[in-house]
């Protein structure tokens, strides 16, 4: 088995892109597109119920701090098992939703497109799973002159393992690229 194999899984979603303020018909500020990646949560030591809003996630707010506008260009959730997952498999539930969705991590399978993944065990132990964010189902604008309530949010859940590990057996990272524009005047 190739340990570098990546399984890419699309989430079914309803096309409902967010609306944003119209751009003025004048010269625009230059923009820069930067990559980002951060660990959203870990699994395997206890029950995990995570809700990660990209608009308020600490790594994203630090990256976007010196800019007035920030827009997601691409984004994905990456489920990564560790070597401990071979002997301690676990099921992880995952769904991308708009931030204003009332769904909770324990309701993922009742959300259209919510999925479950088995991490670990003899068959899928070394496979990384990528779940891309469908940008047509959320508002891409994380930072603007107004605050949007339908920006991307990741829901993730895993029950408490039968034999909890002292260190995590899997983790989930959120990775992507973000367009930043209109620098702010800030004190150094």
From Swiss-Prot:
One of its GO terms (cellular component) is T=3 icosahedral viral capsid. It is found in: Virion. It holds the Pfam family Tymo_coat. GO terms for molecular function: structural molecule activity. Keywords: Capsid protein, T=3 icosahedral capsid protein, Virion. It comes from the Viruses. Coiled coil: none annotated. InterPro entries: Tymo_coat (IPR000574), Viral_coat (IPR029053). Belongs to the tymoviruses capsid protein family. Self-assembles to form a T=3 icosahedral capsid composed of 180 copies of the capsid protein. The capsid encapsulates the single-stranded RNA genome. This is Capsid protein.
